[in-house]
Every structure is written in C-alpha cells, then in structure tokens.
Amino acid sequence: MTDAGLTRAGASAAATTDRARDAAPVPVLVGGVSELFQSDLDLGRLVVEQLQDEGLSGGVFAEELHYGGVAVAQRLEVLRPARLILVSAVARGRPPGTVVRSLLVPPVLDAATVQAAVGDAVTGYVHPDLVVEIACAFRVLPPRTVLVEAEPAVVGPGEGLSPQGQVALEKALQLVRLEIGRAPLLALAWELRPLVDGDRLEDSVALLALRDLLVELERLDDQGHWGRTFALRDRFRLGIAHEHSSEGMDHRDWALWWALVEELDRVEAAEAANP
C-alpha cells in the first residue's frame, strides 16, 4: 500500500474517533475473529453466537469481527472496551484441538509492518494477528486484551467443526465465560493499584496484605490461575475486621477495599458452582 493509502485508512479511523468521542465505553467486548464457513477456522463466530444465545450480563458485548482489520479498529474505537477478549482458531503448530488463553503483550510495530498490515486489511484478509496489528497502529487496542486461541484440525471450505474443533469450542467457551466473570474483579484491582502505592497511606497489616493480594491478582490476569489469591483475601479481610487498617484512608478507600473482598467472594462462589 502507498503512503497515500495508509493516510486515507488512518483518516477514516480518525473520523470514526471523532464520531465516537461521546459514546460511553463498554467494560468487556468478546470478539470472534473467524474465517466464515472455513471449517474449524469459523470457531470464533460460533463462540460469539453461543454467548449471544445464552444472554450476556450488563456491560458485556459479543460481536463477530470477521471483517477487515481497519473496520475492526474503527469498531473498537466506537466501543472503547476496557477489556477485549479475542477468540479464534489459528494455526500455531500446537496439537489440534488445543485451546490456549494468554494476556496479549502489544507488539511494537515499525512503519513498514504497519503499512503491510493495512495493505492486507483493506483486502478483507482476516487473522487475529492482523486485527491486533491494525488496532495497535491506530492506537485503539484496549488496555487489557486476552487471546483465546484454538488449534484447528481441519481448514478449508466447509460448514461445521471437526470433532477436535467441537471439543475446542466447548473449551474456548468455558475460558471466555471465566474471563467475563472475572472482568469486574480485575477492573477493581486495576483501580486500586495506584491508590495503595507510595506513602499516601500508612503501612498496616491490611495494607500490606492488600498489596500482596493485588500482585497475585495481576498474576491471575497474566496467567489465568488463582494461585494464593483466596488465602491472601482471607488475610486481608482479617486485617480489616481487626481494624488493622491505615492512617490516611478516606471513604473511597474503605468502599474499594470492601468491594474487593465482596467481589472475590462472588467470583469464588460462581466458579465453584460452575467448575
């Protein structure tokens, strides 16, 4: 693509930005990136359809993102999700049917890579890597983006999934449901981090426990595993209950601290009920 073409694509995204400025951001967007009716490569669309049929809680959107990367970037600018969950089937050399969840580390792109990505995107080529590259290029990639990827067993024209693809679909749905359920907790932890750094609050049993808990929640966001989270929650709760809190706390601190405990209780109960 020429520099002029790249400029036009950027101008189109900028125009969408102008239209979206007054729109309220959404907390979570589940995006299915798929190649329509291409056997297992259609998995992302099927995940989105299943979630839509089940019904989604307030603030959670699920959409098919099977169109060009520039259009997807424009849609991200409109919705401005705080958390994006991209679901796809993509060949990575893993055993067929394998499903992997990972927290995206945004790529660093040079001008040539951006230009090549936009050139592919305007042709309608669809691939999760391309969606990420274009979103990064136009600076609309959400702060937290999670990838749920299945390894396809069968690719090429065809309706429906292979047996391995069907198993992968169920695994992907389970992982996405977990991500949706954990999103409010992780957003709350993200809000709390800057409030407990530095010396605004005096050290206390509860504050030290909270800092450890937030580190563990960051690990949960990165790796998808609870680790010591609930043991640290109990230590934190005990510190608050025994009034081992910090000098300098205000009403917002108290509200957020107790909200974190309650949110952890909610998520623990929900995941125990749906193992």
Where are each of the predicted segments found?
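A broad detector of the eukaryotic-type serine/threonine protein kinase catalytic domain
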Residues: 153-155, 241
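Soluble extracellular-acting proteins and domains
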Residues: 185-274
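N-terminal catalytic or cofactor-binding beta/alpha core of small enzyme domains
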Residues: 2-152, 159-171, 177-187
